[in-house]
Structures are given as C-alpha cells and as structure tokens.
C-alpha cells in the first residue's frame, strides 16, 4: 500500500482532470479528489478496484437477452473509456442497446453537458419506460 501511495498519489488527482473534454471548466475538481486521498483505506480501495477488475461479458449478454431496456451513454470525447475500442464488443454482446452520445463531453458527460444528458435521460429513456 505504501508503494502504491508513493508511486501514484503525487499525480493521481491531476490525472482526474483528463476525464474531462474541457478540464478548465472544472477548476478545483482535482482538489476535491485530493481530499479523498486523506482517508484511511482509500488506497486499499483503489488497489482492490484495479486487482479485481473482472470481465462482465456474461452479465452483459444476460442483460441483452432479457426484457430489460438497455441503453449506453457516452461522452463524444471520452478518453478514459474510448468508444471505438469497445464498439465491436458492444455490438456482439449488446446488439439491441440504444446508444446516446453526449456532445462536448469526455468521461463524465452528466457533468460536462448536463442539459443534453438530462434531456436524453428524462425525455427519452425514462419516458420510454
């Protein structure tokens, strides 16, 4: 844990800014994240997340094969989870999904373009269901 903290904590908060297409619009986001680093157990949680990242292909296929409405929402400029790296897999596992791409947003489209995100969520997804 100490090695993880030593090697990652100095830059991890600034790295959070890469989730945004326009990080200049979220001044202080890295400072908020920095506060999390003070909590005992936070490093352990990050390590656990990295170590226990599991393949959810079976679960995703199960959801696709069910009657559950299925949507994916992407920021059009997401550099954390790049759509083009996953689209073939998504097409295979979840071909019936309805996709939405939020303009002018990165990994956190609900924050960067909340108007468009909320319009899709409330006026399309939730209205259909």
What are these regions (language model features)?
Residues 3-64:
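Conserved alpha/beta-hydrolase catalytic His-Asp/Glu region
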Residues 18-21, 79-83, 116-117, 121:
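A general structural signal for short secondary-structure boundary/capping elements
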Residues 29, 84-86, 112-114:
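Short aromatic-enriched loop/helix-cap "lid" or pocket-rim segments at secondary-structure transitions
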Residues 37, 41, 81, 112:
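Residue-level signal for the nucleotide or nucleotide-sugar donor/cofactor binding architecture
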Residues 42-91, 101:
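Conserved serine/cysteine hydrolase catalytic core
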Residues 95-129:
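Catalytic active-site module of serine/aspartate enzymes centered on a nucleophile-bearing elbow/loop
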């Amino acid at each position: 844990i100490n090695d993880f903290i030593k090697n990652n904590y100095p830059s991890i908060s600034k790295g959070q800014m890469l989730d945004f297409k326009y990080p200049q619009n979220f001044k202080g986001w890295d400072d908020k994240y920095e506060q999390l680093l003070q909590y005992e157990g936070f490093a352990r949680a990050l390590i656990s997340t990295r170590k226990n990242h599991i393949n959810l292909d079976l679960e995703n296929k199960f959801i696709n094969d069910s009657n559950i409405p299925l949507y994916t929402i992407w920021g059009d400029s997401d550099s954390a989870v790049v759509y083009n790296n996953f689209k073939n897999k998504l097409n295979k596992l979840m071909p019936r999904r309805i996709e939405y791409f939020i303009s002018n947003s990165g990994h956190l489209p609900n924050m960067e373009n909340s108007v468009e995100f909320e319009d899709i969520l409330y006026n399309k997804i939730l209205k259909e269901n």
